[in-house]
């Protein structure tokens, strides 16, 4: 579905859905400004849909637009079907139907996660200067935008959950634990604290 020719992100209203590996963020945009937003689990797209349906009631049916960005195919597929069936909105998928407004200096065959591009575009739009963007989630990304507003790429590393799971899966005697920020002295005095300290310091 191509973006309507008269659709202007700075002047229009829309519903926005950003699907991450763990969490999904949804928002209601009015005249280019986010008026409301919520965060739900990416495992339960129907939870996000309930809020989107409520917001959509304030928008004329023939003017309903949902901006969709996703790094998780299964949830995106479910969300597309739900949006069409229950909201009747036109879906504009970022990068497929509408490019993220950020320059790129990448390999020609490179495929970059839309989440990284959106973060870079948002920071550039706010600062208009060279910057490093760190996004901590299921994965940790560290990206660079130069002084001309061009996304230069960056680095990707495991997030805290992925690091802890890797330790547990790879070493039989290491326990399965949840991440929390370690405090106190810099040395882990037991296995759990040592794991937490290692993961925390890695990031």
Show the residue positions of the predicted features.
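Gly/Thr-rich phosphate-binding beta-strand-loop-beta motif of the actin/hexokinase/Hsp70
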Residues: 10-34, 123, 129-151, 167
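N-terminal glycine/serine-rich phosphate-binding loop of ATP-dependent small-molecule kinases
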Residues: 1-100
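Conserved phosphate-binding catalytic cores of ATP/NTP-utilizing and phosphoryl-transfer enzymes
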Residues: 4-8, 101-131
